[in-house]
């Protein structure tokens, strides 16, 4: 199952979203998930958008019904703090939002879908995908 990061949700709010991202969103049969952190980030972006911007309303009408929003709890907070402390000791400090998003994906065994693979490439055991890039071509194995 997939956990969609803020940049994917933001792309899906656009009037003309990236065709590859939209196609994956529309064709996915597994439940699509996001963190309450990501939902807050895109809602905040919509709130500070210029007057008359209707992207949030479009998102709520067209995209939100297809998403399950995962809440935070104490165990995710503990895991996020552990991850952030580990990353800081390795010289890769990240903000609390990224820590909570990574913890949510890791704890749930989810694939984090993000454009910012580099932000999460150091998280041990975390699987990521970038729907903005074409899928990697299958490599034939010799017989």
Residue ranges and their predicted role:
Residues 1-34, 46-62, 135-142:
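Short, well-structured N-terminal submotif of metal-dependent ribonuclease cores
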Residues 5-6, 42, 80, 105, ...:
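Generic structural signal for small/hydrophobic residues in well-ordered secondary structure
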Residues 8-9, 38, 76, 100-101, ...:
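Alpha-helix capping/helix-boundary segments
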Residues 9-10, 40-43, 121, 129:
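Nucleotide phosphate-binding site architecture
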Residues 36, 73, 116, 132-135:
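Residues at the C-termini of beta-strands that transition into short coil/loop
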Residues 68-115, 140-143:
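Active-site neighborhoods of divalent-metal-dependent phosphate/nucleic-acid chemistry enzymes
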